[in-house]
Amino acid sequence: MSRHSRLQRQVLSLYRELLRAGRGKPGAEARVRAEFRQHACLPRSDVLRIEYLYRRGRRQLQMLRSGHATAMGAFVRTRGPTEESNGAGAPGTLSGEGDDPRKPLDSMRTPKTPLDGR
């Protein structure tokens, strides 16, 4: 087995630190494991995303260690009737939202009024 890269060692260290910091806090260990499992399939070549998630994890670790956190959880958004069911697009985005980066305000459509003014 090859040696881990520096970034891999940092991520593994962060994982262990988060598990230690989450001991005694309801839901923390399960949340840490779930978050790391969710992103385990990221390709090694996606360094920017891995570094972003690493920094985000570092901030969460600081919050857990600060003493202000008593538990750890997550907000889960359920699918609405207007969301795509095939999983296309980013998670949590509505269908048609952000399809064209040149028109960012198109998703904020205003209702059309009839020509007769009613």
Swiss-Prot record:
> In the UniProt record, which is one GO cellular component term?
mitochondrial matrix
Principal localization?
A: mitochondrion
The short sequence motif called LYR motif 1 sits at 14-16
Map out region (Interaction with SDHB) in residue numbers.
53-65
Q: Where in the cell is it found?
A: Mitochondrion matrix
Name the InterPro entries for this protein.
Complex1_LYR_dom, Complex1_LYR_SDHAF1_LYRM8, SDHAF1
Q: Any one Gene Ontology biological process term?
A: mitochondrial respiratory chain complex II assembly
CDD domains this protein is in? Complex1_LYR_SDHAF1_LYRM8 (cd20268)
Residue ranges of the motif LYR motif 2: 53-55
Query: What's in the keyword line of the UniProt record?
Result: Chaperone, Mitochondrion, Repeat
Q: Which domain of life is it from?
A: Eukaryota
| Region annotated Disordered, chain positions | 72-118
Family according to the record? Belongs to the complex I LYR family. SDHAF1 subfamily.
What does this protein do, in the record's words?
Answer: Plays an essential role in the assembly of succinate dehydrogenase (SDH), an enzyme complex (also referred to as respiratory complex II) that is a component of both the tricarboxylic acid (TCA) cycle and the mitochondrial electron transport chain, and which couples the oxidation of succinate to fumarate with the reduction of ubiquinone (coenzyme Q) to ubiquinol. Promotes maturation of the iron-sulfur protein subunit SDHB of the SDH catalytic dimer, protecting it from the deleterious effects of oxidants. May act together with SDHAF3.
What does the annotation say about its assembly with partners?
Interacts with SDHB within an SDHA-SDHB subcomplex. Also interacts with the iron-sulfur transfer complex formed by HSC20, HSPA9 and ISCU through direct binding to HSC20. Binding of SDHAF1 to SDHB precedes and is necessary for recruitment of the iron-sulfur transfer complex by SDHAF1.
The protein here is known as: Succinate dehydrogenase assembly factor 1, mitochondrial
Source organism per entry reads: Bos taurus
